[in-house]
Amino acid sequence: MTESANRALLPAGLRDMLPPDAEFEASVVHSLMSMFARHGYDRVKPPLIEFEESLLDGAGGGTSSQTFRVMDPMSQKMMGLRADMTPQVARIAATRLGSQPRPLRLSYAGQVLRVKGTQLRPERQFGQAGIELIGSDDAGADAEVLVMTAEALDDLGVPGVSADLALPTLVPAVFAAYGINGETADRLRAALDHKDSATVAAQGGAAAPLLQALIAAAGPAARALAELCALDLPPAAAAERDRLARVVELAGADLPSLTLTVDPVENRGFEYHTGLSFTLFARNMGAELGRGGRYQGGGGEPATGATLFMDSVLAALPGPKPAKRLFVPAGTPRAWAQAFRAQGWVTVSGLDPAADPQVEAKHQGCRHRLGPDGIVEVE
């Protein structure tokens, strides 16, 4: 391997983002943040690194295994590089914005770094953009966050946006009602995660028929809700189901084009969520575009939010359109170049007056150049 190749080698899961992708991501993030702002979400910007004890407090505890840690040479305290921005926004809401009126609407965008990638997302560093609605326990807050993030993807041009709704607190409510705990609960939880109805039947005892019915109820929202409503659920689980039905009703009224499915037993990735949660997908894409749901904010404050994963969002979009690049030969009056930029051109100025404009334009990736008689196409 050459010295140049060695210098370009990056750790697994990390990459350089090159033109035009870097600019494309920036423009997409700008569009998202502008859309969030128009809906009353104020932007915050937490630091990339902070003390471990605050970064991993509360909902942040769910990211502990994915957090890089370093020793702060100034304070001699452990610090963590954020693996997710939601816990940081929750901290800001509970502390620096603790006296602000509720509900509090915040937005954010930035890079996160994780210890390990996954099969569907091997990248360990990627961009996030999202919203948090803090201080409301109303089903309308859940619906607002779901609809806003799905609508934002629609506005960007993502095809066939859909949301898979989950109730990570539903199964624990059933377990509690039937006295299922310890190793039995762990085995059943693993079986439910893999939709293993046979193991549920063998291990579930009196709760087995109900748990099997929950597995079978997964599917389009209307059918899933009909099947869930036909089940004799314990009171706490029934309350979760009723809230789900209300959110589906509100979301369907606000964004009828959004395809909704329900998986009543899904839990993976929602470990710190305390209520209705969701995953966003696009047509013909296996990777999730984002996740959201209800969680407990700082001081036990009710909160809900959603995070979009920019690498997946960009992959779901048509590629960036080539910029209209115009080569302007050296010596061209500056006012002329300014006028062309005002018309939407990207101008690339020549540096060598003796250079051949046709050749230089090709070298600079310009499909047009400024000639003596105006703009001409580069052959």
UniProtKB/Swiss-Prot annotation:
Any one Pfam family here would be: tRNA-synt_His
Location of the protein in the cell: Cytoplasm
- SUPFAM superfamilies recorded for this chain? Class II aaRS and biotin synthetases
Say where the protein is mainly found. Answer: cytoplasm
Q: How does it assemble?
A: Heteromultimer composed of HisG and HisZ subunits.
Q: Which family does it belong to?
A: Belongs to the class-II aminoacyl-tRNA synthetase family. HisZ subfamily.
Checking PANTHER family in the record gives: HISTIDINE--TRNA LIGASE, MITOCHONDRIAL-RELATED, HISTIDYL-TRNA SYNTHETASE
Further notes on this entry? This function is generally fulfilled by the C-terminal part of HisG, which is missing in some bacteria such as this one.
What does this chain do?
Answer: Required for the first step of histidine biosynthesis. May allow the feedback regulation of ATP phosphoribosyltransferase activity by histidine.
What is this protein identified as? Answer: ATP phosphoribosyltransferase regulatory subunit
Q: Which organism is it from?
A: Paramagnetospirillum magneticum (strain ATCC 700264 / AMB-1) (Magnetospirillum magneticum)
